[in-house]
Amino acid sequence: MKQILYKLFEHQYLGRDEARTILQNIAQGKYNDAQVASLITVFLMRNISVEELCGFRDALLEMRVPVDLSEFAPIDIVGTGGDGKNTFNISTAACFTVAGAGFPVVKHGNYGATSVSGASNVMEQHGVKFTDHTDRLRRSMEKCNIAYLHAPLFNPALKAVAPIRKALAVRTFFNMLGPLVNPVIPTYQLLGVYNLPLLRLYTYTYQESATRFAVVHSLDGYDEISLTDEFKVATCGNEKIYTPESLGFNRCRESELDGGNTPEDATRIFDAVMEGTATEAQKNVVIVNAAFAIRVICPEKPIEECIALARESLESGKARETLKKFVELNG
């Protein structure tokens, strides 16, 4: 590791194979915490390259616990985190909204590293027991139209660095990697990122894959569609900026999306959205993220129709019933 760190400190970049080997060594415990923290710090000081990102991703996908749910052609809705906004669990709520609308979802998530509550915190608050058994995940898809993959069960490197990430409490290149390494390799993905350079990096990376995707970024820094500002949506060969008003939504204030101070707070907000008792801002931000996910699956549908499908799922109680069945089956 010493030679690697010297190379990076001299402002050199890693090759794809080199990055792949380094992450494999991290997963195998070949470096101590101080060395790993030093490596992470390098990528806080400069942008990661495409070759480095792809190499790290290669390692995680090679080491993953494979899960074949391809027959469901599922979507994942996931953000990098690390935007410093501490929102409630918008993408998780959007996943259940999309599943309630009849589209298969495989959510890949983790505990919060830079926020109060990640998707796994909310699932755990509901008594969900995480599993890496394909038969149980397939049953969840068949019965509920959604399965949940707790990242550390499927990616040993993510588990190995979890304590370091939590101790640092700032975004790291592992935030960038999380959305890229869903072990199912879903057919569709809606990916949220915390800045425009990463939006371009993700778009470039996904153009080489078979996954149909959209990458979203709110221009005021959110790693999801926040409705607090204009937002950009990038797909293969296309980028477009939307305003909340152009889609029929009022702008939100940042305070209206806050996730609270504890996982319990975040779960109460999540439940209020599912129950239909949340604020208009909280419901709308879930609806718009779910709508753009549906648009990834059905690009021929106008976005207005996708918004209507997402709204109907949430407001009719279909999303709530999906969550209820999911918790009963997986608790």
Swiss-Prot record:
It is an enzyme of class 2 (transferase). InterPro entries: Anthranilate_Pribosyl_Tfrase, Glycosyl_Trfase_fam3, Glycosyl_Trfase_fam3_N_dom, Glycosyl_Trfase_fam3_N_dom_sf, Nuc_phospho_transferase. It comes from the Bacteria. Keywords: Amino-acid biosynthesis, Aromatic amino acid biosynthesis, Glycosyltransferase, Magnesium, Metal-binding, Transferase, Tryptophan biosynthesis. Its EC number is 2.4.2.18. 5-phospho-alpha-D-ribose 1-diphosphate binds at residues 79, 82-83, 87, 89-92, 107-115, 119. GO terms for biological process: L-tryptophan biosynthetic process. Binds 2 magnesium ions per monomer. Its cofactor is Mg(2+). Gene3D superfamilies: Nucleoside phosphorylase/phosphoribosyltransferase catalytic domain, Transferase, Pyrimidine Nucleoside Phosphorylase, Chain C. It catalyses: N-(5-phospho-beta-D-ribosyl)anthranilate + diphosphate = 5-phospho-alpha-D-ribose 1-diphosphate + anthranilate. Anthranilate 2 binds at residue 165. GO terms for cellular component: cytosol. Mg(2+) 2 binds at residues 223-224. Pathway: Amino-acid biosynthesis; L-tryptophan biosynthesis; L-tryptophan from chorismate: step 2/5. Pfam families: Glycos_trans_3N, Glycos_transf_3. Belongs to the anthranilate phosphoribosyltransferase family. Homodimer. Catalyzes the transfer of the phosphoribosyl group of 5-phosphorylribose-1-pyrophosphate (PRPP) to anthranilate to yield N-(5'-phosphoribosyl)-anthranilate (PRA). This is Anthranilate phosphoribosyltransferase. It comes from Bacteroides fragilis (strain ATCC 25285 / DSM 2151 / CCUG 4856 / JCM 11019 / LMG 10263 / NCTC 9343 / Onslow / VPI 2553 / EN-2). The gene is trpD.
